[in-house]
UniProtKB/Swiss-Prot annotation:
Gene3D superfamilies: Globins (1.10.490.10). Monomer at high oxygen tension and high pH and dimeric at low oxygen tension and lower pH. Heme b binds at H74, H106. Globin V is the major component of the 6 globins found in the Sea lamprey. Keywords: Heme, Iron, Metal-binding, Oxygen transport, Transport. Residues 11-150 form the Globin domain. The keyword Metal-binding applies. It comes from Petromyzon marinus (Sea lamprey). One of its GO terms (molecular function) is oxygen binding. Belongs to the globin family. Signal peptide: none annotated. This is Globin-5.
Length: 150
């Protein structure tokens, strides 16, 4: 299933949740490295997205991005937000509240172009569980909620 950022998706099944937790656990256990790798892959594949991060200005190579404390800090925040979503799969109201709050911050305070949520979600899905429909469904749920303030 391709990742979507509008509309709705079916709830996750118990089997999908189990598979997501299993795929996510090793990624989160090395979240500092995994998060940076994901964010660097996102910026190298979508350089225009970097303009929404003023602190990353002038970081033009993957090596510069990996060494940046600001990149590492933001990568950790992204990984922790996904981890919160994984942890909240059984409480979608809790997940929704957190992600709607995050949407508001990105829309109003940071003025991020929402098209990039889906692009980043695809990088995360490819890294964690390439081609897994359940993980892509979770990423779709996240993207739909992140667009809610736009």
């Amino acid at each position: 299933m391709p990742i979507v950022d509008t509309g709705s998706v079916a709830p996750l099944s118990a089997a999908e949740k189990t598979k997501i937790r299993s795929a996510w656990a090793p990624v989160y256990s090395t979240y500092e490295t995994s998060g940076v790798d994901i964010l660097v892959k996102f910026f190298t594949s979508t350089p225009a997205a970097q303009e929404f991060f003023p602190k990353f200005k002038g970081l033009t190579t993957a090596d510069q991005l990996k060494k940046s404390a600001d990149v590492r800090w933001h990568a950790e925040r992204i990984i922790n937000a996904v981890n919160d979503a994984v942890a909240s799969m059984d409480d979608t109201e809790k997940m929704s509240m957190k992600l709607r709050d995050l949407s508001g911050k990105h829309a109003k305070s940071f003025q991020v172009d929402p098209q990039y949520f889906k692009v980043l979600a695809a990088v995360i899905a490819d890294t964690v569980a390439a081609g897994d429909a359940g993980f892509e469904k979770l990423m779709s749920m996240i993207c739909i909620l992140l667009r809610s303030a736009y």
